[in-house]
Every structure is written in C-alpha cells, then in structure tokens.
Amino acid sequence: MSRRRAHDTEDEGYDHRRNKRRRVSENQEIEDRLESLILRVGERSTSSVESNLEGLVSVLEADLGTFRLKILRILSDCAVRMPEKCTVYTTLVGLLNAKNYKFGGEFVDHMVKTFKESLKLCRWDAARYSLRFLADLVNCHVISATSLLQLLDTMIDVSNEDTVPQVRRDWFVFAVLSTLPWVGRDLYEKKESALESLLLRIEVYLNKRSKKHHNALRVWSSDAPHPQEEYLDCLWAQIRKLRQDNWAEKHIPRPYLVFDSILCEALQHNLPQIVPPSHHDAFEYPMPWVVYRMFDYTDCPDGPNLPGAHSIERFLIEEHLHHIIETYHHERKDCAAQLLSFPFKHKIPLEYCIVEVIFAELFHMPTPRYLDICYGSILIELCKLQPATLPQVLAQATEILFMRIDSMNTSCFDRFVNWFSYHLSNFKFTWSWDEWDSCLLLDAEHPRPKFIQEVLQKCLRLSYHQRITEMMPTTYLKLIPPTPSPNYKYANEEAANLPGTTVAHQLVVAIRQKCLPEEVVNILKEIPSSGYSGEEMSDGSFNALKIDVFVQTLLNLGSKSFSHSFAAISKFHSVFRALAETEEAQICILHNIFELWSTHQQMMVVLIDKLLKLQIVDCSAVATWIFSKEMTGEFTKMYLWEILHLTIKKMNKHVIKLNTELSEAKDKLSKADSSSSDSDDDTPHKRKKPITHADKPSEEVVERMEEKLEAANVNQKRLFLIVFQRFIMILSEHLLRSDTDGRDPDTDWYRWTIGRLQQVFLMHHEQVQKYSSTLETLLFTSDLDTHILEVFQQFVALRA
C-alpha cells in the first residue's frame, strides 16, 4: 500500500469518527430538547395548556421513530415525579395514543412495569402516583374502564389477606380511595354497579379494621372544636361526600375535556392482570396518621371559603401542598415561593391552607418528615414574601395552639415550643405577652405557664439573659429563667466546712498552671478513700468525693464557654475514665454536673452529650440518673427529656453503624469467595479483577464484628428496659397512691409523665419495635394498670 493511500484511509477514518461524534451530539441535543419540552408543558406561559399540548404532540409524533424509548421513559418519570401535573400528561398520552395506537400500548406496558416495580421495591408514593396515572388514562380513552376496575378489585383483595400487617391492607385501600377523585365520575357513568360493589367492599373492610393506634397519633386528646380523624376514616367520609355529589369535584384540572372529540375516537388498551407482590417481613409500609385540622370556614375572613373537612377538595389541596413541601423542602425560599404560587390560590384562603398544612407536617406523629427548623424557616420566608397577610394568619394559628395546649400531645408540645422560640428569635422576640397573662394564675405544672417557661428557656439559647428579661413584662418574672451561671460550692462562704475544699483549691492552681493529667491524679490521691461519710464504699468501686472535687473544679474552670468545657474534658479524658469505671461512678459524675450547672440547661445537655461521645459515661447510666430521686424536681422539664432522647439516639446510631459495617464485611467476604471461584472457571480474557487480600475481611474479623453487634444489641435492649421499667415504677406508684388517698390521678404531672412514656415509644419506634415481644413478656404484662398498658398496646398497633 502506498503512503498516499494510507494517508487517505487515515483521513476517512478520522472523518468517520468525527461524523459519528457529531451525530451523537446532535441526538443528545434533540433528547435534551424533548425532555425540556415535556417537563415544561402546562406551566405558566402566554399560550394555553391545550395549545401547548397540541404543539408538543406534533413534535413528539415526528420523533417517535428515533426517540421512542427516551419519550417513554420521560413520560413515565413525569407521571411519578410530577403528580400535580397528572392530568396534563395523561392528556398528552391520550393524544399520542389517538395518533399512534402502538405507542399508546407501549406506554401502558411501560407504566404498568413502573407500577409493579414500585410495589416490589416498597416505593409506596411512586406506586400510588402510578396507579392514579393509569386511572386517569381511562378519562383519556387510553385504558378501558373494565380493566381498571379489575385492577382496583385486585388491590382491594389484599384487604382480605390473613396473617399480614394491617398497615399493608390499609395502604392498598388508601391507594384505591385516593385514586377515585380522578376517575370516579367516569366509572360512575360507565360502570356504576361495579363501582358500587368496589365501594361496598371498602366499607366492609373499614368497619372491621382496628383503630387501636388512633389515640397515640392524635395532636390533642380532645375533639373540640375539630375532630381528629384517622386518615382512612377521613378519606372515606370525603369519598362518600363526593359520591353524594355524583362524583363532581371542582379542583382537578382536566385538559382532556377540550380534546374529547379526538380522544373518544381512539382505541383503548386493556391493562394486563396485575397481582400485588406477596407480603414479606422485610417490607415496611407507611404508618397510619391522623388528619390535622386547625381552621374551619369561621376562622377565615371574607373571601374564598375554606372547603369543608369532608369535601374532597380539602384532601386534594392538602395533598398538593404536602407534595410541594416534599419537593422543595431543601431550599426554604423556593419552597415558600412555590407554596404562594399554588395554582388555585384565588379559589381558596391560601394562607390558612398553607399554615395548616405546615403545622400538620410539624405535628405529624410519630415523627415529622423533616427537622423542626425546616418548617420554621419556611414560615419565616412566607412571612417575608407575604407580609400583609401571612404574619396575621400565623399569629392567629399560634393563639389557637396556645388556647388548646391543655390537651396537646407532649411530643407536639415540645415541637410547638421549639418552633415558637425560633420564630420569636427571628422577629426581635416581639409578642403580645399581656394577652396571655391569665396563665400566671395557673399551677406551675399546667401546660400554659409551662409552655411560656420552656419557650423562654429556648429563647435563652438563642439570645442572652438580659435580653429575655427586658422583653418580658414584669408580671412574668416568676417564669423567667434564672441567670445561667455555675454554682461552684468550693468557692462559697460555707466552703471551708466542706470536705475536699483544700484539694479543690490545689486543683484550681494546678490546672491553671497547665498541669498534666498525671499531676491531677496525684493531687486527688490526697483525698482519703473513705469519701464523705468516713466509711469505705461497700464495694470499694469509686470515691464520690474525688469525683465531686475533680468534676466541679474542672468544669467550673471551663465555664467560660462550651469550647472551654470541651477542651478541659478532652485534656483530662484519662482522669474521667479512671474515675468513671462503674455505672455508680458515672451517675456521680452526672450528679455533679447537675449540681454545678442546675441553672444552665443547655450547658448540661451539651456536656452530657460530650461525655457520651467520649464514652466517659454509658447510656444506661444517663437513663438511671434521669429517673433518680435527685431529678424529681426537674422531671417535667423539657431539657431532661432532650438528654434522654439524645442518649437513646446515640445508642441507636451505634447499633446501626455496627450493623452496616457487618453487612458490608459479609458482602465483601461473599464477593471475594465468588470472585475466586469465578476466576478459576473463567478464561484468561474474561477473568474479572479479583478482590485483593487487603479488601477481603477474614472470617475472624467478621466473627468479632458479630460479637460487637450482639453486645451492642444487648446494651440497647438493656437501655430500653431501664427506661420503661422506671416509667412503670413511678407511674404505678402515683396511681396506687392516688387510689389509696382517694385523689384523682389525672394530674398535670401524670399527664406529662404518661406523655413522655408515649414519646419514647414513638420517637424511637423503629428500634423499640425489635424488642416489643421482650417488653410484653417482662414489663407490659396483662396485670399492669390499663392506663400504662394502653400506651404500649397503641404503639404495637402502629405496625400491626
């Protein structure tokens, strides 16, 4: 071959590769353009939705030959990820089906596959949106009403399954009920008897299902002025009202009605038989909830009426607003803007709907979807964007919450405190406190004065003491927190009479001179082993006076800030560990922190959190200390339960971490084994790169990890047993004493305490659930007082 010909061949090859890259680039540009057009269809523009759809259909029809799979994928993704535009996309699919029957069939198959996959992977919201989309395709003459009814009947069959959790049966019924607003009218006109039969089956199920969980999920224990309905009961009442109205609703936009003459000529597809996947123990279903109500039409000023509690429009509006929060919650400004741009805002009192939905999220039981601060920051942005109306509605909501706080769930009480203090801190702590001064006449444990006291404690964390004192009327003096300062007893006037004062003063000098931990240990040796009473401890395990002198002196020297305290603890970590060898010694450390910092709740919280992180104190020691006699006066204060929950969370995270590490190690081990066996079978060309010896954990390492996890599970179980046993003891003692004295046991203290018991169950439900059978066998037995036992039974019913 000549040099010239070789050169030509190289040029041709280069041109071929360049042309191929150009084609790929052009195809990518077209795909991106198609995706952009599909995603933006129906959004606000100068032209109508209908004309947008007509234009898009023409574009997609021309590109179906080349980009069919891409278009199928985008449309099915939109169906799941943009449920608020469901009817826009069903209309688009309907128009495409009218022009290209084959594509319509392919899309239905693709959507069915998405639905089945969502069910299989427990993506419950995605499955519900897929079902809704399939149902709305009946309105667009893409799917036959008969085949949809067969699918809905199959889903209701799940409600008759035996030996499966009720939450599974509930979800399938909920999915069907929440689909009916879209397709109910069409089914009513075409298949009325079949629809009535379906509704009858649903009614039979709803009448027989257990609602033991209901009281555990209520925000208020009272139904006045608004009933707190269980979610399926509420939706069923809304569907019945819709049926009475002949399935006519006023909220869902239906662009396909404009194209009815085109769509009705199209051939329809039948859904294949879809069998829901069988239940597996690994499946997790959505937990039940209570529908939150704060406002009714009497609360709203002149203007659009708030839809009634049992109108389907209320359900549709709330679901849409919840979805906006879910979509935009990561960016508070976008979220607030999207909420205020709600497409039907002129038909409803939007500000009231938004505030109610945000508080519904904040007070959602057992836990809110997102952090408390997420909702607080969104409300602040809403007030900035709508300063003329939103702050007034929010103030009205706050007033309603405060007036109803007497019967508020304890967990919701905490969230209300956290939100209100955060909100005040962003608005110069301005509030009309004089309007609430009637609470000053109530007992200190009553929820109203308790709320103000806790709010001021939280405001103190976000400001400083003088600012809090200045912002409050003088009548509230008894509710204002004391000045947060250390009470170092070895510097008091009577310190000379205290044992250990001399050593404490030596310790102060040594630490200020930047002594080493070993020098501190030597100074502490001057304290006799006999402790306070002059007698040796029965087990000789720890010296209370040594702990007293060391802990109070060190933390007083580090009292300037959190950072100073942390630095002191870290430097003398070894001394702490040496003194805290037993649980009793650890409880003694906690006692001294409380004695020093009893007026500074936040300092106690962060110090105990630090001691847990450094493994100076165990979780079980913290739990035992919280329920000790010493803490009786603090028992109804929020910070104490903040400490308990951070302790339990610390333990839970530790168990989850060990579990994850063990699973990963087992995966690596099994992959390494299979990789080595594959490498023996494969040819040299096909052989995969084996996992290296360094990556592969040994069986001994895996065994040690299993032992660690088992020990952590034992500690976790022990922690929960300690907590629940102490609750049972103090509550049983209170009930027995009240019965003996002939007093009403339903005191403020009792309601706080039973509420805290319920809070532990619900806040840590995933972890406690593992030990429910153990708890039932050892603690929550049938002979326990019914008031206490009911809390446990309601918790178990959440996933029953």
UniProtKB/Swiss-Prot annotation:
The modification Phosphothreonine is found at T9. SMART domains: MIF4G (SM00543). It holds the Pfam family MIF4G. GO terms for biological process: 7-methylguanosine mRNA capping; mRNA export from nucleus; negative regulation of viral genome replication; nuclear-transcribed mRNA catabolic process, nonsense-mediated decay; primary miRNA processing; regulatory ncRNA-mediated post-transcriptional gene silencing; RNA splicing; siRNA processing. Residues 1-26, 669-699 are annotated as: Disordered. Its main location: nucleus. Belongs to the NCBP1 family. Component of the cap-binding complex (CBC), which binds cotranscriptionally to the 5'-cap of pre-mRNAs and is involved in various processes such as pre-mRNA splicing and RNA-mediated gene silencing (RNAi). The CBC complex is involved in miRNA-mediated RNA interference via its interaction with Ars2 and is required for primary microRNAs (miRNAs) processing. Also involved in innate immunity via the short interfering RNAs (siRNAs) processing machinery by restricting the viral RNA production. This is Nuclear cap-binding protein subunit 1. The gene is Cbp80.
